[in-house]
Amino acid sequence: MYDELHLDTLGDKKTALFLIMSDTDSTFNFLISMVYTQLFNLLCDKADDVYGGKLPIHVRCLIDECANIGQVPNLEKLVATIRSREISACLVLQVRSQLKAIYKDNADTIVGNMDSQIFLGGSEPTTLKDLSEMLGKETIDAFNTSDTRGNSPSYGTTFQKMGHELLSRDELAVLDGGKCILQLRGVRPFLSDKYDLTQHPNYKLTSDYDSKNTFDVEKYLNRKEKIHPGDEFIVVDADSLPSA
């Protein structure tokens, strides 16, 4: 057996590592959690010991279906410390309550340490409530008129300023599918259009554009290592190794 992931080298040069697990069978999901735990620890140590505190290449972890990989130990502390080492984690959840179910009281700490949050849509009550409160209120002008008729008719108008939720829970639940709400640290939340992936310069390289671009995992795993003239190898005689 040998290590072919080389997790500690991800911050040395531009590298893409894909961790793919079944979305219907959770038997081995704990492996993903273990990989992330080891990845964060190795990269933080290397950033401190080799590069003076920061990796030369930023490492971005896009953790889709974060709730399905199990608990990453001490994640609430890691998300607060990895940023200074040029490491970031993007947690993708269906609903915010998934995070609470796994990390309990530490869920709020994890969310609080995120520099940006994006809401793509949903109808889960807790998520909508938290988002509506985060957006705050706006000031609206309210006019009330009264008209009394009879022997002594009267007419009156009152004007007042009132606070109103910027977006209520029912408005968030029916948010346009092409819109999203983004909050960046130090900036008021704002409504934005979702990015059109078909406009990305590399879209033509995806399988959505052309099925010929689909990556065949089985074919890749079954590939044979090609040996070229001049390649050097270390030969170890197992019989000469000292016994344990």
Model-predicted regions and their roles:
Residues 1-87, 102, 170-191, 200, ...:
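P-loop NTPase motor domains
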Residues 196:
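Short, surface-exposed polybasic-aromatic patches that bind anionic ligands, especially phosphate groups
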Residues 79-181:
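Conserved ATP-driven motor cores of ASCE-family P-loop NTPases powering translocation/secretion/packaging/pilus
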